[in-house]
């Protein structure tokens, strides 16, 4: 990080998969509400304050929601102790001091619906179809982060508040600060500001799993707007062990090396025998729920059959 700056993160181990049926999309809605009023920064006061300090929304100030987590992100000057104090106040407000005002909910409802419409195109449909195949009928497939537009249109502030009060619990949160900082000052401030959060009983959640495929299946998606022709082969495998020992680390290095070697081999073959554009094979853990072996090839028009045959022969 640049001198005089620090990166701040609030990690919340809660996302769309925790939503009830009538909450589909509210984890993401709540993320939006985090920038629309809190205990110390009413309405748009937080954004105005940060922008007055030179922060740019999207670059220095951002957040994302996924199936299993919501992450809030700041990158701000750290040389001024008062600014550091204010930044950690913002993180603490996100953790337990959001207003979720009814008027702000109505305003943000339109923003989220517009965001949903703007992302609805051929590429998005293709990506969603691929993801649904990967999720294989698990709970994840019923809890896409963007949610259900009917829920977004009709939810009340109380519905969002219910999700917030249930899942934004200290036991499901972590704070990280990295950069040009005084670590002792940061520790003291974190204890001071986050020590005031609710100590209610922690919510319980059973990890979701993605079942293995019961049989081989083929799904074909066509759309004239798509500019590429891709073949993806998915195999669900046991989840690899977390890296905790030298043996685990060795296994991780072997997997990484094999992924890279195969990619180099396939790209070299494509250069010498251009029947496809590029290809890759990669093993990774997915949502901490399953291991995935993904083989992908981008095919060339007019050479699809040859490209597929050569790709499979190389594996």
Where is each model-derived feature located?
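A structural supersecondary motif
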Residues: 56-60, 234, 259-298
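Short, solvent-exposed loop/turn segments at the edges of secondary structure
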Residues: 3-5, 54, 65-69, 107, ...
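Short acidic/His-enriched helical or mixed secondary-structure segments at domain edges of catalytic enzymes
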Residues: 111-130, 209-229, 268-277
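Histidine-acidic residue clusters that define the catalytic metal-binding segment
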Residues: 72, 129-173, 183, 205-209, ...
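Extended catalytic-interface subdomain
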Residues: 74, 95, 227-235, 241-260
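An aromatic/glycine/proline-enriched structural segment found at the starts
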Residues: 137, 174-232, 237
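Active-site-adjacent, His/Asp/Glu-enriched structural segments that form or flank metal-binding
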Residues: 12-27, 32-125, 154-155, 159-172, ...
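Mature N-terminal segment immediately following signal peptide/propeptide cleavage
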Residues: 1-11
